[in-house]
Regions:
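N-terminal, polar/charged subdomain of small-to-medium soluble alpha/beta proteins
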Residues: 1-85
């Protein structure tokens, strides 16, 4: 699976990228079809971080989720939890 991890007006460190790849890999394993690529975008809105994730599946379906939190890792974890449901 190809990953595209970026930030709008914020730096995305290597540790966060590794965390995203690891956790997102676990989340998408629940789908029966093979995911082809994932796009994760982080941004900051006022006093909180926003994480938007989009995963394209080989069947043509797309799974998306969006979450807000005061910490960037918590924003991603909440986003991944929404995608898992």
């Amino acid at each position: 699976m190809r990953y595209q991890i970026s930030g709008k007006q914020i730096d995305i460190g290597e540790a966060l990228q590794t965390h995203v790849k690891t956790e997102l890999g676990v989340v998408v394993k629940k789908y029966a079809v093979r995911p082809t690529d994932a796009l994760v975008i982080f941004s900051k809105s006022a006093h909180e971080f926003v994480c938007e994730a989009t995963v394209h599946l080989s069947t043509g379906l797309t799974a998306t989720a969006k979450a807000h939190a005061t910490e960037i890792y918590a924003a991603f974890d909440a986003c991944a939890e929404k995608m898992e449901k």
